[in-house]
Amino acid sequence: MDLRVLNPDSEGIGEVAARGKTVMSHYLDDPELTAETIVDGWLLTGDLGRFDSSGHLQLFGRKKNMIVTDGGKNIYPEDIETVFDGLPVKEYCVFAANYIWPAKALGDEMLLLLLRLDQGQEFDEALKQEVVARNRRLPDFKRVGGCVIWDKDFPRTAAMKVKRVALAEEIRKTLSRAAIVEL
């Protein structure tokens, strides 16, 4: 199998593409999706990555999850989420506020940490301070500006990945921007 990184940015990160005898050639009865996914014989995986100096592929996240800041920097929610690993909550994930609640005037994008607390747990001052302390480990442009408390389990795929689109839609229908607890 051959792999390459398409349209790399200044840090060498781009979309991973694959081709080979074991890579799919098309979607059955879906020429439009095939045309979007297979380009010049290369399968566009939707994963973002780069090759390191040893030739190993490093993955950074999914293209559809990437957030572009006002300053033009690319942020991968998965990168930010690793800083919050071990946070004493049931589950969490990072979103751009404007992705959940589209704003008419873009600018000053706020990143949010969506928290699913354990049963009976509250977002108290101790938990807030732990979030703030972990947040300080991130460069300024990657810091979350607030938290949103969510009372339902996150929808997941069979592979246990968060269904971000479905979760954002559910939040949009249920909560407003007023639910953001600023840090």
Residue positions per predicted region:
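Thr-Gly-centered strand-to-loop micro-motif
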Residues: 5-6, 18-19, 38-40, 44-46, ...
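Conserved C-terminal "lid"/linker of ANL adenylate-forming enzymes
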Residues: 96, 112-113, 132-183
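AMP-binding/adenylate-forming catalytic core of the ANL superfamily
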Residues: 20, 25-26, 48-140
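Conserved beta-loop-beta connector loops within the AMP-binding
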Residues: 1-19, 50-54, 102
